[in-house]
Amino acid sequence: MHPRVLAGFLFFSWTACWSLPLPSDGDSEDLSEEDFQFAESYLKSYYYPQNPAGILKKTAASSVIDRLREMQSFFGLEVTGRLDDNTLDIMKKPRCGVPDVGEYNVFPRTLKWSKMNLTYRIVNYTPDLTHSEVEKAFRKAFKVWSDVTPLNFTRIHNGTADIMISFGTKEHGDFYPFDGPSGLLAHAFPPGPNYGGDAHFDDDETWTSSSKGYNLFLVAAHEFGHSLGLDHSKDPGALMFPIYTYTGKSHFMLPDDDVQGIQSLYGPGDEDPYSKHPKTPDKCDPSLSLDAITSLRGETLIFKDRFFWRLHPQQVEAELFLTKSFGPELPNRIDAAYEHPSHDLIFIFRGRKFWALSGYDILEDYPKKISELGFPKHVKKISAALHFEDSGKTLFFSENQVWSYDDTNHVMDKDYPRLIEEVFPGIGDKVDAVYQKNGYIYFFNGPIQFEYSIWSNRIVRVMTTNSLLWC
């Protein structure tokens, strides 16, 4: 990620707007006129350069397709220049109000603070949390950045601080209005005088310290990144990615992309509690290994660490998402997954628990324990799973064994477990992930995948794991 000039304090003048002929995907017949108007507004807000007076540059009107392409590229979508369901879904996700483009040539250089000791002041509070909860969230959010830089943050209670923090609704005094519940959550301004560094939070949102509503700590940590001079990142695993995703209750660790960005401005600190920071996986890494694979309504989901790639059958470029985008109830990292097409369900496993999802929605009464499937107590995790729709059987792989589950009678088959090498000779004694396609089973073991013929019961081809992602 590169720290660039931000547009947080460039004001919008909607009197200068015009109609943009937004192209659509011919297959997306369910898109409404309201959807197209929303998409136009989104692109104007986040992908059109403005001049210092806040007026949209008229040269941008002829480049609507380019802006749509830029937005699709930024979020790792298939770049078509046409509005489709996937693009619209991304546009409708809750996000930061700072634009994603860096074409704001009104500043001579990248902005950063010229000092390491900064002050902040909480001007007012949200009624959603106690004062102490709000103060704790902001204190933690600043610590995210001070842990990896020489920066120090001190709270003051009166006067003007470097970073003034406030809650407001709709038009709240900076000519950059909020939009009510969801949508735009907050915005912040880059280092500088007046509004410079200030962070504003939409009080029409429900702010929480949990997975419900919007977690104030996570949003604040992101906004304070802007207050320090960081732009949005294209890395979906970065804190500075513009879309909000709840990342879990466990201790937050600043991703490597954000560390590199902030240290390029202020240098490293000497009190970083972590020797390593989480990195987003590279799909073309020759040593790539996988955690799980499953199909979902014709698409393929490929899980690695706290992410999954979404691979469309007619596309080469895979889209990368956080696993938590399924929902905050899911774990950050999973062990196994499989689809049950006739029930329109996928099952996701982590440790001794599993979840059932219909599409991207988690079913009630989950998670359940894997012991309910018939696994004995000594089985601590499922490493891979594969469902056969025609026979109603599901194979579960755990350590060096494979189990066969009868989905019709909801019992384990009597002749199992068996050794993996005995049932599928040649693939090794463990399976990281597995899926089937066109009469072949694909077993993944570290950086290697085996193409196994169901008809001849033998390996017919050995490939690299990353070839699944067209590398």
Curated annotation (Swiss-Prot):
The active site is at 223. Residues 1-19 form the signal peptide. Gene3D superfamilies: Collagenase (Catalytic Domain), Hemopexin-like domain. Hemopexin repeats lie at residues 281-330, 331-377, 379-427, 428-471. Glycans are attached at residues 117, 152, 158. Zn(2+) 1 binds at residues 172, 174, 187, 200. Residues 268-471 are annotated as: Interaction with collagen. Ca(2+) 1 binds at residues 128, 203, 205. A motif (Cysteine switch) lies at residues 94-101. Disulfide bonds join 284-471. One of its GO terms (cellular component) is extracellular matrix. It is an enzyme of class 3 (hydrolase). The proenzyme is activated by removal of the propeptide; this cleavage can be effected by other matrix metalloproteinases, such as MMP2, MMP3 and MMP14 and may involve several cleavage steps. Cleavage can also be autocatalytic, after partial maturation by another protease or after treatment with 4-aminophenylmercuric acetate (APMA) (in vitro). Residues 264-283 are annotated as: Disordered. Transmembrane segments: none annotated. The keyword Cytoplasm does not apply. GO terms for biological process: bone morphogenesis; collagen catabolic process; extracellular matrix disassembly; extracellular matrix organization; proteolysis. Residues 273-283 have a biased composition (Basic and acidic residues). Zn(2+) 2 binds at residues 96, 222, 226, 232, 240. Its EC number is 3.4.24.-. Ca(2+) 4 binds at residues 291, 335, 383, 432. GO terms for molecular function: calcium ion binding; collagen binding; endopeptidase activity; metalloendopeptidase activity; zinc ion binding. The C-terminal region binds to collagen. The conserved cysteine present in the cysteine-switch motif binds the catalytic zinc ion, thus inhibiting the enzyme. The dissociation of the cysteine from the zinc ion upon the activation-peptide release activates the enzyme. Plays a role in the degradation of extracellular matrix proteins including fibrillar collagen, fibronectin, TNC and ACAN. Cleaves triple helical collagens, including type I, type II and type III collagen, but has the highest activity with soluble type II collagen. Can also degrade collagen type IV, type XIV and type X. May also function by activating or degrading key regulatory proteins, such as TGFB1 and CCN2. Plays a role in wound healing, tissue remodeling, cartilage degradation, bone development, bone mineralization and ossification. This is Collagenase 3.
